Amino acid sequence: MQKLKQQVFDANMDLPRYGLVTFTWGNVSAIDRERGLVVIKPSGVAYETMKVDDMVVVDMDGKVVEGRYRPSSDTATHLALYQRYPSLGGVVHTHSTHATAWAQAGMAIPALGTTHADYFFGDIPCTRALSEEEVQGEYELNTGKVIIETLGEVEPLHTPGIVVYQHGPFAWGKDAHDAVHNAVVMEEVARMAWIARGINPGLNPIDDYLMNKHFMRKHGPNAYYGQK
């Protein structure tokens, strides 16, 4: 597990490097599917003092199997996503400013241009509000459930992120690094959408044919973006 712990540590340290977190407002995890174990950031530990061996290993029920700290308070949300989506290898949650602003506004982040379409096939959805019963009950698990409910039958790697109503963004990917990459992109396109709508409040979404071209040339079966 040491290699995975190093990857998760590095991914967590990327959050302040890319300006996605203030204080301890974020967490990254990754899963070892063969062993059924997840490595995640410890709860409330400052990035400035955090070390590789501070990463916490939990099983799929959230029980700590390795580590001296409590795992992130959002662990149950991460586990719900891993259990529902076998294609996910990493999950990240932040309170990055612009993506969180869309979450607080209760609005999806609209697909307005090709930067968005290179990573997200359509709008980045916003969940419904959690009920009082859902919040007072198993809050973090129910957060995972409302993300799953909102995505429906969408392939999660085609929409590698979401904003949870009045809370903030979650993103995911093939591994921890990929999840953080998608979280960085989500914050950037959230900022771009806010600026663009300020310039032109009546701005239409990106045309479907342009969105399809940009997404498929990077992620489709005949993708040709980048190097082999």
From Swiss-Prot:
Give the metabolic or biological pathway. Cofactor degradation; L-ascorbate degradation; D-xylulose 5-phosphate from L-ascorbate: step 4/4
| Reported induction | Induced by L-ascorbate. Repressed by UlaR.
Cofactors that this protein relies on: Zn(2+)
Q: Which reaction does it catalyse?
A: L-ribulose 5-phosphate = D-xylulose 5-phosphate
Q: Does the keyword Nucleotide-binding apply?
A: no
**Which of UniProt's keywords are assigned here?**
Carbohydrate metabolism, Isomerase, Metal-binding, Zinc
Task: Give the binding site residues for substrate.
Answer: G26, N27, S43, G44, S72, S73
Q: Name one GO biological process term.
A: L-ascorbic acid catabolic process
Q: Name one GO molecular function term.
A: aldehyde-lyase activity
EC numbers listed for it are: 5.1.3.4
Catalytic residues (positions): D118, Y225
Q: Record-annotated residues binding Zn(2+)?
A: D74, H93, H95, H167
The UniProt note on the cofactor reads as follows: Binds 1 zinc ion per subunit.
Cited InterPro entries: Aldolase_class_II_sugar_metab (IPR050197), Aldolase_II/adducin_N (IPR001303), Aldolase_II/adducin_N_sf (IPR036409), UlaF (IPR023499)
Q: Name one GO cellular component term.
A: cytosol
| Domain of life of the source | Bacteria
Please give the function described in this protein's UniProt entry. Answer: Catalyzes the isomerization of L-ribulose 5-phosphate to D-xylulose 5-phosphate. Is involved in the anaerobic L-ascorbate utilization.
What family is reported?
Belongs to the aldolase class II family. AraD/FucA subfamily.
Q: Record's HAMAP family? A: UlaF
Q: Can you name this protein?
A: L-ribulose-5-phosphate 4-epimerase UlaF
User: Per the UniProt entry, what species is this protein from, by scientific name?
Assistant: Salmonella paratyphi A (strain AKU_12601)
